[in-house]
Amino acid sequence: KDGTPTPKPSNTPFLEFVGTVKIPAAAKFIIQEKFVLNYGKKAKPGVRIAYLSDNFKQWFLDKIEEATPEAVLRYAKLTRAALDDEIRAEIGAEFEQTTLAQIFARMALQPDGREGALLTNWWATIFYVPDVKGVLRAVSVHWDADYGGWYVSADSVGSPDRWGVGRQAFSR
C-alpha cells in the first residue's frame, strides 16, 4: 500500500481485467511447510521467499488448508488507487476468496522472479484469503530483485491505506 490520498469519486472501475490462470488441484496444504524463507546465495531449488511479514506469520503460519480442486483465477490491474473494500466490492463477495495454496502455485511458476501473472516489478499482487481464524485478510506478494525472493505480507482488509495504480488483484 502506498498511502495515496483519497481520490475524488469517479464512475471509472477500479479494476481492468488482464487475464485468467489455471491453478492445479492441491492436496492438503500445510502453510508452515511451504511458506519458508529461501533466498540469497544459499537458496535451495524451488520458490524463493525473502520475507514473511509479522502479520502473515501470526495470521497464517498455523493454518492448514484442505485439498482444493483445480480452479481458474482471474486477475485485474488497478486503474486507480483503491481500498481493499473498493476492490472487493468490484470483484464481488462470491469471487473474492482465494487460498494460500493457489498463491503458492503461482509463485512456484515464477520461483525466481521471472515474468508471469504475478508482478515482478516490486509492485504488489493482491489476494484475499481467510486466515487461521477465518478472518478475511489481504495477502500480497511482490518480488524483491535485490534479495532474490518474494516478499509475502498480510494486512487487514479494513486498512485505511490504498493500493496504488498498476497493482494487481486475483479472484475466482
Predicted feature residues:
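A binding-site-centric feature that preferentially detects glycan-recognition modules on secreted/surface proteins
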Residues: K1-F95, Q102-R172
